[in-house]
Amino acid sequence: DFNHVDFSYAGEGGNLSLKDVNLHIKSGQTVGIIGGTGSAKSTLVQLIPRLYDVTKGNVQVGGVDVRNYNLEVLRDQVSMVLQKNVLFSGSIYDNIRWGDEHASEEEVRRVCKLAQADGFVSEFPDGYDTMIVQGGNNVSGGQKQRLCIARALLKKPKILILDDSTSAVDTRTDALIRKAFREEIPNTTKIIIAQRVSSIEDADQIIVLDDGKIAGVGTSEQLLKTNDIYREVYESQVKGGGDDE
C-alpha cells in the first residue's frame, strides 16, 4: 500500500518526483505500471525495498510500514529485476544460485522453466555449466533478462518487481513468462513496469503514471474507456505496429 506518498530525491522542500500517491495492491495481484519517460515509474517501485525512503506518507508491505522492517528481512521478501541487471563471470548455475546459494539443481531448473530460460540453456553444449563471461556478453539481451528473472524467482519473494525487464524478449516469450507466473506463483505479488502495453494488458490492475502522479487505475478494458494517456499509448502500439511479434 502507498498512503499519500510524496517523494523528492532532495528530501523535504525539494522538487517532488512523486506526488500524493495512493495505491492499494492486493497480495498475489499482477499490477502493471505504465507512463512516459520521467513519470517516476522506477522511483515508485524503489520505495518498496527502501532503496529510497518516502519524503511524506508511507509505504506498507503486509500492513507494516517498510521503515519498521529489518532491512534484510524486507529485501528478502522483495525481488527486483532491472532492465539491465548484471550477470557475473561463472557458470549459469552459479549466476542463478546467487538468488539462493543453497538451492538444488532441481530448483534452479524450475525457476529457469518459469522464466522461459530452460529451453535455450539446455541447448548450450555445457547446459547449466556453461560459463558466462563478465557482464554476460556471451548471451543475448533477452537471454540475460530471462536468467535474471530466474535468479529473482529463486529467492521465492513475496513481491516480484520487473522494471522493464522483458524489454529485450519477444512478445510471445513475454506472454509465456506471464502465463507461467499466473499458474506457478499465484501468491506472489507481481509488479511489472513496461513500455509495451502487451506486457501489462492482462494485469489485474494497471497504474498510469504521469509526471509523478497517478493519472488512472483500472484494467486495460476500463482504462481504454476512461484514460486518454493509456488509450493513446495502446492505440499507437497496437495500430501502429509498435508492438513487435
Describe each region flagged by the PLM.
Residues 1-245:
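ABC-type nucleotide-binding domain
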